[in-house]
């Protein structure tokens, strides 16, 4: 499965040097939002550049941050069935987000996020999100709904893969 995913991502992703970093309003989560709302949100986010191979977060980290990928790819690695060995779980690219579980449930990270290529990120902390929600309730609701739906889709996909592997 990982081999197929790598081939598919490689077929559609531009070369790392050619890829431009997305602006916030270009991301699917925020299309159609008012310019002033986007500007307020962007002012609350950090921007972070991470070199290929570097950890973005690790198992056990207590941060409650949501990461939005402006450019590049990140691989999610996690132990399976109590093993200490990490397995590739997913790859996310330009326009995707990751880190949603710890952002929503405020628990420690259960996986590692590793930059597969050099990446640029928008980072939204839970504290900043809560402040944003006071001023932009509709945007906060839409963001939480989008995160929840995406996580549900990813869980269904992972459950389907697990079922296939058991056959």
Could you describe each region identified by the protein language model?
Residues 56-61:
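Short phosphate-coordinating micro-motif centered on Lys-Gly-acidic
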Residues 3-55, 103, 164:
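Cyclic nucleotide-binding regulatory module and flanking cytosolic helices
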Residues 55, 73-75, 112, 120:
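Residues located in well-ordered beta-strands
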Residues 87-145:
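Cyclic-nucleotide recognition modules
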Residues 62, 84-85:
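Short alpha-helix capping/helix-loop boundary micro-motifs
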């Amino acid at each position: 499965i990982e081999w197929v995913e790598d081939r598919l991502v490689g077929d559609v992703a531009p070369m790392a040097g050619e890829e431009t970093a997305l602006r916030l309003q270009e991301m699917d989560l925020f299309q159609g939002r008012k310019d002033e709302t986007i500007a307020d949100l962007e002012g609350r986010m950090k921007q972070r550049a991470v070199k290929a191979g570097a950890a973005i977060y690790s198992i056990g980290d207590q941060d409650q941050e949501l990461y939005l990928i402006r450019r590049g790819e990140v691989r999610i690695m996690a132990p399976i069935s109590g093993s200490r060995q990490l397995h590739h779980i997913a790859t996310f690219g330009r326009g995707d987000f990751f880190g949603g579980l710890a952002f929503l449930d405020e628990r420690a990270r259960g996986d590692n996020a590793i930059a597969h290529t050099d990446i640029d990120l928008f980072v939204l902390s839970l504290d900043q999100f809560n402040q944003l929600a006071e001023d932009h309730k509709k945007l906060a609701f839409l963001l939480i709904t989008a995160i929840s739906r995406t996580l549900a889709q990813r869980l269904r996909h992972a459950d389907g893969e697990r079922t296939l592997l058991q056959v």
